[in-house]
């Protein structure tokens, strides 16, 4: 059984890898971090009693090339892509997700810049903020943020990705996102008992 501190560091590493994947999938080291995130997520899933067979199968897959992942990313999520990575484009979220996220980042003393080239409510930014909160050893704030933001629309995003025939690598990423939602829900249930 992992200690809560170790569990939070594991969650932090997964969210950090997902932030990189959904902001710059072609950057050096991103796919290796993805592979590590799959392993860590499988371990976390096992800890909370979630079956790991699907993640174990993902671990066995060879890594694609950065170029193929970038091309698929552009096809799915680019300006003309059919799937949005912005919370503001999904139902069930707050009135102005971008402004709400910006406020949350500022409350956490994080500078908000457009250096990364993505809006504040972009999935990569949300995952990055989760990683920061967990790294700062503030899991309660991370869980509240997850429940208010990505947790509200990730299931719909997962379905949208899976419904796209051109999704190959990101179909696997959707599986990882789905498992993360299950892990987060399981962690909340465990706290309530």
Language-model segments: what does each one mean?
Residues 1-193:
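Surface/interface-facing alpha-helical segments and adjacent flexible terminal/loop regions used
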């Amino acid at each position: 059984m992992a200690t809560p501190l170790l569990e939070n560091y594991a969650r932090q590493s997964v969210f950090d890898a997902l932030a990189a994947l959904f902001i710059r999938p072609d950057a050096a080291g991103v796919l290796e971090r993805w592979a590590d995130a799959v392993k860590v997520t499988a371990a976390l899933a096992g800890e909370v009693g979630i079956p790991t067979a699907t993640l174990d199968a993902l671990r066995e897959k060879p890594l694609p090339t950065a170029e193929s992942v970038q091309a698929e990313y552009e096809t799915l999520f680019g300006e003309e892509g059919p799937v949005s990575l912005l919370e503001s484009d999904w139902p069930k979220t707050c009135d102005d997700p971008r402004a709400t996220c910006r406020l949350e980042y500022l409350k956490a003393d994080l500078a908000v810049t457009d250096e990364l080239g993505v809006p504040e409510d972009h999935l990569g930014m949300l995952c990055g903020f989760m990683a920061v909160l967990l790294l700062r050893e503030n899991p309660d704030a991370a869980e509240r943020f997850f429940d208010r933001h990505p947790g509200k629309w990730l299931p719909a995003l997962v379905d949208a990705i899976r419904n796209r025939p051109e999704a190959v690598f990101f179909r696997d990423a959707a599986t990882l996102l789905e498992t993360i939602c299950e892990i987060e829900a399981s962690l909340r249930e465990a706290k309530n008992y």
